[in-house]
Amino acid sequence: MIRRGCIIHGKNVGLHGDRTSTGAHCIAARSGMSVMGLLKLYIGDKTTPCPKCGEVGVIVDGDYRHSNSAAVAVDGSAILCRCPQGTHFLIAPGTIPQLSVAKAGITPSFAPEPEKHAQTGKKKKREITLTIGVFFDGTGNNAVNTQNMMKAYTAGHYNLDDPEAESILAKCARDNFGVSGSGATSYTGYYTNIHWLSTLYSRRFAEDNPNVQRAVYIDGIGTDARKPDSTLGQGFGISDTGVIAKTNKAVSMLADSIQAALDAVSNQQADNKLIVRVLQFDIFGFSRGAAAARHFANRIQSEDPAIISAIRQGVTGTDFNGSPAGKTRFIGIFDTVAAIGTPVNGLNPHSADTGDVNLLLRPGVAEKVFHITAANECRFNFALNSVKPAWPELALPGVHSDIGGGYLPVTKEHLFLTRPATETVPYSQPGEKTQAYRQAVAQLQTLDKSPCLAPLLRTNEISAETWHDDRLPPDRYGQMQKRSFAALTLRERTVRNDWPRVALRVMLEAAQEAGVMFDSILSKDKELTIPDELASLRDKALAMGKAVRNGQTPSTFSQDELDVIAEKYIHCSANWNAIVVNTDGLIHGGASPSEMIGFINRPDEQWQRTVYSMDGKKI
């Protein structure tokens, strides 16, 4: 074996003929720099057909710090094909095999064309409509990190349906990936509806159908694949993992995605000359990803030069008759929460001010828009950015991630529904006899009036709990004293993550009405199966969505139906959790964090969600 001897920032440089994680070989497309006679690989270079999915892959990332300003492919560089994102990547070992790659029949793509191909006759024209589906995941959601985490988790023979899975995942994230706390959010959650939509998005091309689709998945705000999550991005939606940065990432992936789609069609249509008659987008998003989807759609409508340039690069070598920046066919969004912290609004994500993020969806921005919102969400930091009355919007039961997804299959909730009240009392005084306890009990009247909480209160046991901190000195009379706390709690509650599958189907139907093509959900897809007790409620939700899209007033769920959903399937996202609970489930410590920073999931005023119109006014 011959040592490769070419390394950039600790990683081996990719060379012509290198294998990939799926067994394909990489093909250099640029003449110039070589190592031992093998040309270097760069972003945009392709692979032989992937043995797993059959599609030619495209190298989509590398090291941008190379001296000649080109992005050089290195060991681990991602490769885009039809395989799940994160599973196909370049393998650049430290040595070069003695066997020449030329013997394997892998020729650089810039090599002179054989004479017999140069003399091909006139080809028949074939017009296609190319649709790029762009899928913006939610804040703290990253399908690549989730997938890698699931592999590590299952390798440890853990059960994902274990209610304690969240704590086990946190340990796995720390032990296997070196991430913890807020840096591990995307490693300890689960797949969202954005992930499922991107995997179901049909990439099949039929000879009798001119429609071609290609999916581009964008990881969620505050996250990067295989990196710790960003506190700044998750908290305020800004910086290099913020909302606008994610739309920039989508633009940077356009050219390669377009070229890969055209290459796949060309491989099936070798005797035809392709003409792209229309290039259009389907754009999906959840949470801040929904804000990114809206901002990206506005960039398309305004004919952003960066998008025009990316499209031109992607269609190079193919006739293109569409609009320079393309157009948007469908925007499908789940519970838009922009929550942008800016210097102007004092870094307050509750503010209507979204800085440079453009949420306004003007007429003509897309052929169809559909927004599903969370009827039971009421957190202060999760104000809703509505699209009503300009576009159809349906509120379904559930909180934010009951609609967009991302909860683990089974979770156990230990929640403080009120901010703990506190007072210093004699050590012998029972907690139930304190003013703090009476204040906590009195707040139950406020909770009872909240439509967001009503189904949960009807179907779960709410308790008034007391605890104390006895690490206090005696009073001036020498009497022992304690710091007594009290709060309303919701404890030992097990919740399943099946309801988001209903919202997924409502969005699928809306998108399909707009012409979007998806593969069918198969009965073997257990992760997307709906429990029998939710089947009729799914049908009702589908009918409600159709009514809203037709401009009609939808029916509503009855109290009994809401209680069925709430008992086991609606999470309680709003809480005052900043309290330490020990391994025995006992509470200790107080409530010192500030409301803005420490209680990030605290409820909005009166447990009523703040809703902003597209022009930033409270509704």
Residue ranges and their predicted role:
Residues 1-115:
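Intrinsically disordered, low-complexity proline/glycine-rich segments
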Residues 112-619:
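Active-site- or binding-pocket-proximal scaffold segments within functional domains
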